[in-house]
Amino acid sequence: MRTVFVDCRWELGAPARGRELYLEAHIPGAAFLDVEADLSDLSVENAGRHPLPTADRFAAAAGRAGIGAGTLVVAYGSLGGAERLWWLLRHFGHDDCGVLLGGLAAWGGALRGGEETIEPAEFVPHARTDDTIEAGEIDRRLSDRTLLLVDARTPNRWRGEENPIDDPPGRIPGARNAPWADPLPELPEGELVAYCGSGVTACVPLHRAWLEGRDGRLYPGSWSEWSQRGLPLERG
């Protein structure tokens, strides 16, 4: 099996920064996939800030990165970019993938700058239907004690304090806080659902739970969709 490294670094509010960092230094041979251009479809309206890409869109991006049958993908990044790629790969049927925990800083080998010549591959998507949840189902099940909602945003955003990202601020009623940058807290039993601001950092607690043998679902639209639909919210 061939190993493919993929750099998924990005910065919220600075779309070009991820590629700039990649060009400065990356794991030799690594491809680059952009969270907003490749791992999202920003043309989709009313679905949050980072809607999921279609199967065809993701397949094209994955193929450009050299991902296909017989490849083991190792993703690294920042702000949940690597976990977003991990989640999308599994969502579209490619389970041979992992995340370099600690990101590029954990890589002990040489680095290289500039562009890479990546041999393209054919990525054939086979989308799962059991790993996402939509706002309507969550709304209907807010009083369902078997649904375990986890909010991956920072504590101040989870509490609903004023901040420059969430408008309006708040959280989905009943959601527990599991900040993406912290270790996964101990969670009770239940049907795990993760969300964040836009469906990127929510993939971090899902990945950590998976490492512990627990599957969960992603709410792709997350708070940036929920908050615009007039649905219930909590603060404090």
Task: Describe the role of every protein-language-model region.
Residues 1-236:
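Cytosolic catalytic domains that perform sulfur/thiol-centered chemistry
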